[in-house]
Each structure stands twice: as structure tokens, then as C-alpha cells.
Amino acid sequence: MRHFGTVSPAALTVDDVEFKSLYRKTEYEAQTADGWTLVLTRYQPVPRPFAQPIFGEPLLLVHGACQNRHAWTSGQFVKNLLFFGADIHILELRGHGKSSVDLQRRRAAEADRPPPADLEWGWDIDSYFLQDLPAAVAAVKSLTKRDKIFFCGHSMGGMLGYGYAGLHDDFEGIVTIGASSELGKGFPILKAIALAEPGLAAAIDVALAAANLREAVGRRAGKATSMALARIGAKELAGALEPRAAWSPRTFRYLPVDEWIRWVDTAFTKKSYERFRTLSAFLTILANPSRATSSDVRWLMRHGVEREPRRVIAQFARWIRNGELACYRTGYDFAEGFPRISVPMAIIFGDLDKLASMESTAGIYRAARSEYLLWRPVKGNSHLELTMGHDIRQICYDIKNLVDFAVKHRGRRPSLPRIEDEGSARR
């Protein structure tokens, strides 16, 4: 980093500026109609002596499945956008990060009211779409006193944005990163997994039921034997056979991705990361290790991964099996709203990404009616590193350009100069 005072403002780059000098950080809450308290983290830009072309423009960031706010903060995504002056608001969906299950219990106790009905991992993608995203949009608009805001979603967050933008007029521009509009298209392995999901879920339920039955029978037998031994005076042996800890039956309520990743992290050293990079050409379904640093990846593994409810996974599988993105509670098919999207839009994906590829994002690109419409791959990228890898700077430039375009054309449609007649073109 060059010393700030030795570089003219016009020549400054984001690398010349300290991250913490770009913002004031606060947190605030949004209340959903079904009783959840969601936390948003705001990075409010501060004026600096260099160009900030989108200063103060509110931008809502929404993470993907099994993630939290650190999907955006584990690399330099937020810093790059702050350098341009964006007013960043990061939503954490219910059960993720600071919008945790524990927070709901605390808020319910403080208000002397029951916690949300779906608190014990009973929500699905419809909950994110019908409750969380509308509450967050309303909160950002209220705090910034804006009628419209900008939106950026990664993976599932981008899919929610597709559906929302087709129904509502709250976005002045929308950016999606690694967000498929036809999930599973061109990815037969994912389709096979989705087809198997109902059977796999049922098998897990049966296995857990059998384990619970064995445990219950064993505990009852131990209790009965302990009582019998106590009656004949064998108290020491009776105490050894008495079931110790309280027990509750095990159920399949969520996918414990956080626990899996912690297990992986124990064997994840810089040396093993470099070894993994040499094999990455064959293992780029979720990430391409060559496009991110080992420290950023490990930090994200430790802080940015969350468990996801079973119902969310089941809804993803249903989307893939049916070839649709839909809100099943209302019957709304997201694709029906694609032609109603006319605001500036950027659809960005990794050229190695199997989850959101050119094939699986083509539907939204072809259906949207935006005059400013960007659809492009990021070379060498897969899925996760799009928000924290080596190439985020070019993505942030795309976001800046979209916001700048929308701001400059508020209240008027963009138009190119028109040539009056052929003669004027030759003069």
C-alpha cells in the first residue's frame, strides 16, 4: 500500500486506502410479519478526497444458502464498493449469523411473547421470499428515506431478487452473482441428487427412528435394572446402570453444514490448500481454489458457514426436479415475473460454475426487459469465490457502473443520438 498522503486523489486506488477509513459501521433490526427479528449490518460511506461516483446510494446485499454476512466481508468485496461510495446494507436471513435462533428467543423473552412458530428450523425458501426480503427492503428504504434502493444477491440471494423484482417496484437496479434462473439446467449430477432427495430424506428419517427406538428401549431397560438392583441393596451397581443425561429423540431438522466445514477445517493447512489447488481443475463445483487465498477461504470456513433447514434443501430439490423457481405458498412462478423486470440489471456468474452457468442463467437474460442488461461470466471462477476471491474488483466495477448509470438516468430513459437523415451522416 502506498502512503495516502503521497498519492494524488486522482491516482488513488482502493489498495491505497485503509478499509476502516471508508465507513461508519452500525447494526439495525427489521421485523418480519411472522415475528422474526432480522439484523442488518450497515457500512455507511464517509466523504473522502477522491471520486466516489455512487456516494450514498443504498445497496442491499443478500447472501446465499448456508452463509451469512461474511460471504461479503471475508474478502474485499465491501471495501471495493465503499471505495466508490456505496451505502451498504447486509441482510442476514432468518437463522443465519446475527439473525440467529438464539436472538429470537431473547427478543421473545424480553417482550413476553411466544417465539416465532417456525423457530426450530421449520422455515423454507418461501419464508425468505415472503417474509425476510420484504422486511429488509422496507427497513433499508425507511432508514435511508429512499423510495427505491439497489439490490445485489449471491446464489440463493440472487434468486430471491429475481422473484422480488418481478413483483415489486422497490429496486432501482439489480445485480445477481452466481444466481441461476433455471437451477440444475446443464448439471445432470445435481438433477440426479434432486431426484433422489425424497428417498434420501425418508431413509434418514427411518435410520433416526430406529436409533431413537434402540436408545429408548435401552434407557428403559437400564432404569428398570437400576431400580431392581437398588431394592436389593446393590446401590453402587444400580448407580452405574442408571441412565445419566437427559435425552431427547434425534430428528433430521437441518443440514449441519457448519459442523462438516469445521471438521474439514481441522485438516486444512496452507500446505494442504496448495495441494488441493493442483487438483482444482477437477473439483470446481463450488469453488476454484486458485482464485482465492488460503487465508480468506479458511476465514470464511470458520465464520461464514451456517446450517440450513431441511425444508430449504427440500425446496431447492423440488425446484430442480420441476425445472422452476416458485413460491409454493402463493403459487407464484418467478419466471412469470421476469418480463416485468425493466430496471438496470447485471447477471454475473463464474465460467466454471456448475450451479449458475451461462446455460442456467440464460432464461432471465432473455426474458428481462431492462435497457441496461449485462450478462457475463467471470473467467476462471466457480461459485463461492465470486464474492471473496481475486476477481471481485471487476465485479464491483460492474456494480458501480450499473448504479452510476441508473442514477444518471433517473426520471428519463437513456437514448443514443439519432441521425436525422443519411446526408447528415456523411457531412
Regions found by a protein language model. Name each.
Residues N381-Q394:
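Catalytic histidine-centered segment of alpha/beta-hydrolase-like enzymes
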Residues V343, S357-R366:
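Short alpha-helix in the alpha/beta-hydrolase fold that links the catalytic acid
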Residues L91-E120:
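Glycine-rich "HGGG/HGxG" loop immediately N-terminal to the catalytic nucleophile
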